[in-house]
Amino acid sequence: MQKQQLWERYKNLLYHDAELELSVDTSRIDFPEGFLEKMDPRLQQAYQEMEALEQGAVANPDEHRMVGHYWLRAPELAPEATLAEEITSTLAAIEAFASSVHGGNIAAPDGHRFTDLLIIGIGGSALGPQFLADSLGGPKDLLRIWFFDNTDPDGMDKVLSGIGAALKQTLVVVISKSGGTKETRNGMLEACQAFERAGLHFAGHAVAVTGSGSELDRTASRENWLGVFPMWDWVGGRTSVTSAVGLLPAALQGIDVDRLLAGARACDQKTRSRVTRENPAALLALSWFHATQGKGTRDMVLLPYKDRLLLFSRYLQQLIMESLGKGLDRDGKEVLQGIAVYGNKGSTDQHAYVQQLREGVHNFFVTFIEVLKDRQGPSMEVEPGATSGDYLSGFFQGTRSALYEKGRESVTITVRELSPASIGALIALYERAVGLYASLVNVNAYHQPGVEAGKEAAGAVLKLQGEIMELLRRQPNRDFTGEEMALALARPEEVETTFMILRHLAANGDHGVSVTEKDKIWENKYRSKD
């Protein structure tokens, strides 16, 4: 296609909204003539399902739950007045709490103001707050923010080392809907120990974001934590960033959460349109459907040309892959749906995997994200007539053209600048696009049975570890190979898992397991040191 033809196609397909200061360009997705019209009946059904969801229909039948993350930025849409009041009062409580922390009215037990903020959570309880912190944070942050987002001991040690002596002035927010998420529980216990070793009272530094009556809620109440904020069962983790999960850390950091919500609300209003060309989320969903043949046949490569959007690909990985990656459709038919998402940032990626994108296997489509405003304040010229930002823009446009020359399709999303409002709009845009696409391919976007299966399997490993430790302690003078241990436990089918558990136990001194190494690693002998 000639450049003039591409320009005409660009004008024909471009969505631009002056209020949102956002554009969605699908001109480099090779929709055939009449594709939008052909898909309209299916989209109308998707719009109808989305409207029912917003009105309070049980959109997650597996868990018999409503799905209400859109109400978080428009409480008046909630199907019950009590829900609207809870949303409104929670936002007011978040802002009041953050103001009291910033003003020193809520302080550490020794009276010092809080200077640092440690967020403990995993999945959506960490990815959303991390994305907001990284995209909108800066030198004027009111609290320095840190994260425990895994159950990796060394990772937590690294964070605590970074906090250092400021631990005594660190506010801790523990986020878990059920209160029983093991990674989050482990992080909380590690933090408790760090505070105790420093001679500090953890409860005097702690805040919970959790479900009413959860294990974490009971702990916070019993120990008189500084505060508890709600997580409702009608908000999923991956769509919780505009709830207390994301708003409390952001407000404490000093981000304008009202503008964040306003941006999301404005985008929600635009993406309710049933006129597809006037609905940016629908255009995204159609792009995904065409690029992947509605079967996930291609990956989505996310290339934001902005360092502050580096974590957006990780945030979207969960939002898209956990929502769309399903083995069964809503009728119980096996479909193996999903779209794999990966990415980093431009122009860094031009020196990494863009080589394969242009010249290698064609199993992807690209989403470019362009931010027009380079920085706050003027830029120097790195050469006559050109700034660093000019180069970034040039590299974006050049990569887009170079890929399309080789038949690599792409979508480009453009925002004028990064702000709480534009980040809110991007979040809302993708939440809606995921919901619409899920309707197009007939999957439930609001459950995650595979995640639960992984948790159950992990629990089985820990149970087997307990059995191994019990046998080692009962027979302290006996050496076991992995195979011998599995047979002794009458679990021969678990020999590989048994071997891996023994290797890990011996590598760490916490459980008192020693190893005698042999030429063949699977013949290594393990015993209790006790």
From Swiss-Prot:
EC number(s) on file: 5.3.1.9
Source taxon at top rank: Bacteria
UniProt cross-references to SUPFAM superfamilies, sorted A to Z: SIS domain
InterPro entries, alphabetized: G6P_Isomerase, Phosphoglucose_isomerase_CS, SIS_dom_sf, SIS_PGI_1, SIS_PGI_2
Family according to the record: Belongs to the GPI family.
Function: Catalyzes the reversible isomerization of glucose-6-phosphate to fructose-6-phosphate.
UniProt protein name: Glucose-6-phosphate isomerase
Annotated organism of origin: Citrifermentans bemidjiense (strain ATCC BAA-1014 / DSM 16622 / JCM 12645 / Bem)
Name of encoding gene: pgi
